[in-house]
Amino acid sequence: MLEVMVRHRLGDFALDANFASDGGLTALFGRSGSGKTSLINAIAGLIRPDHARIVVGDEVLTDTDRHIFVPRHRRRTAYIFQEGRLFPHLTVRQNLLYGRWFTRPLQRRGDFTQVVDMLGIGHLLRRRPALLSGGEKQRVAIGRALLASPRLLLMDEPLASLDEDRKAEILPYIERLRDETRLPIVYVSHSIAEVARLASTLVILSEGRIAAAGPAAEVMTRLDLSPITGRPETGAIIETRIVDHDAAFGLTRLRAAAGELRVPRLELPAGSKVRVRVRARDVMIAVREPTGLSALNVLPGVITEIGPSEGPIAELRLDCRGDALIARLTRQSIATLKLSNGRKVYAVIKSVAFDSRAVGRGSDMAKSADVEAVVAEDLFSGATRRDHQSADPAPAAD
């Protein structure tokens, strides 16, 4: 359990944040200057807030009303920055063990071999940081943090300095960290794609205040948050499970409360949990059950909300048997199809809208049936864009 209440003024900027999380990975999302780093620094004890109460588990780290402020070196919080900040004169092994030297023996948790195996860095132990890629440096930094036996892991935009390939390399390890260690994580990011993939709890900040906080799947589908999250990235996340694979066509069949989805083949075993991200711009709407489509995914649903228009565009929120989806349509399509709250419709999603490159790679993820992944990170690049443009249009859809 993580409980955070912070009120603090930094010059002209006022931070006023209050949220709670049951564990897992809590993502702090917002634009630059929204207060994310100030908030995580308050949790770490790097700043002393004007008024605050911060509790991790059963330990109070800060409570200004009771004059409690645990110094940062006694908080047992590990902090991972944008850059790995490894010691250049030490090997990877020595960097990993550095934090452990300063941890009391009775507080030490985590086995060296298990941490090394989980992060896939066994072959790097004799190297020095200068010979590591950006993704490798961050994996070593995560390992060093874990071996310091923290009660809380803080990650301040750890992927911001990495290119897309290195991000794809390290994301599965953060997923494993979230799922296998049971260590509460606070993760700062301004990337909605990272948040959609990783977050258990999502906290959205805007101008120093919390605009929304709660389970990630619920917060992601709030239409009023599009101006903060960015309309091109607006979408939903759906928890699914792999049913089977279609070797002949290179597809994987997923089952969710909303129905079945077919996506490009995932290298995960049947029964694995998969988190699917569906962007609003990739959802078409039909008022009758469509036939003769190239799109393989058709989900029945009911319109529960029509958001305010922005120029010619508006967004709809659908309830698909308990799963929420968002669709972005023109106001002309909404008028032509006579769409309104309570109207039964069909959401149409092309399989090629789910980019399998955003799924965790290889056996690292396949080892656990509880691994979650995200598809649909870069939906319309390369061949995917060409396929979308050349496909037959869906009848009665925007």
Q: What residue spans do the PLM features occupy?
A:
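Conserved ABC ATPase "signature" region
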Residues: 59-64, 107-124, 175-176
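ABC ATPase NBD coupling module
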Residues: 61-78, 102-105, 109
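ABC-type ATPase nucleotide-binding domains, specifically the catalytic core motifs of the NBD
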Residues: 90, 94-109, 118
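Conserved ABC ATPase signature
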Residues: 128-132, 136
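A short, proline-enriched helix->beta-strand linker immediately N-terminal to the Walker B motif
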Residues: 147-151
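Internal alpha/beta loop-helix hairpins
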Residues: 179, 189-259
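Glycine/charge-rich catalytic "coupling/switch" loops of P-loop NTPases
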Residues: 260-307, 324, 328-398
